Structures are given as C-alpha cells and as structure tokens.
UniProtKB/Swiss-Prot annotation:
It is an enzyme of class 5 (isomerase). It comes from Staphylococcus saprophyticus subsp. saprophyticus (strain ATCC 15305 / DSM 20229 / NCIMB 8711 / NCTC 7292 / S-41). Gene3D superfamilies: Macrophage Migration Inhibitory Factor. This is Probable tautomerase SSP1389. One of its GO terms (molecular function) is isomerase activity. The active site is at P2. Belongs to the 4-oxalocrotonate tautomerase family. PANTHER family: 2-HYDROXYMUCONATE TAUTOMERASE (PTHR35530:SF1), TAUTOMERASE-RELATED (PTHR35530). The lineage of its organism: Bacteria, Bacillati, Bacillota, Bacilli, Bacillales.
Length: 61
C-alpha cells in the first residue's frame, strides 16, 4: 500500500488539490503497478512562516 506525503505551501484551491491527488495517484499506479484502491495521498499545507530555505522564511522574502 503506497502512501505518498506531499508538503507544500498553503494557497492552492480545492480544485488544484483534488487534481494533485488524482495525478499523483495515477503516477504511482503507473510506475509501481499498485492498485488505485491501495494508494493513499496525504497533503500537508504549510504556512509560509513555517518554511525556510537558506535561513530565510518564505514569509520574509
């Protein structure tokens, strides 16, 4: 049972997140041969203030 965790900055629409789940599921099915019914996608949205690169938070850019 593949479980895919996706972390991204908040701000996407519900439609975008729905499409993300569909497309990731299709990609996992195609590349691993797993049944769609067994594939789980977990989306975690982060605030820009909770994510940083090179010592700088995204909210400070």
């Amino acid at each position: 049972m593949p479980i895919v965790n996706v972390k991204l900055l908040e701000g996407r629409s519900d439609e975008q997140l729905k499409n993300l789940v569909t497309e990731v599921t299709n990609a996992v099915e195609k590349t691993t041969g797993a049944n769609k019914e067994a594939i789980q996608i977990v989306i975690e949205e982060m605030k820009a203030s909770h994510y940083g690169v090179a010592g700088v938070r995204k909210s400070d850019q």
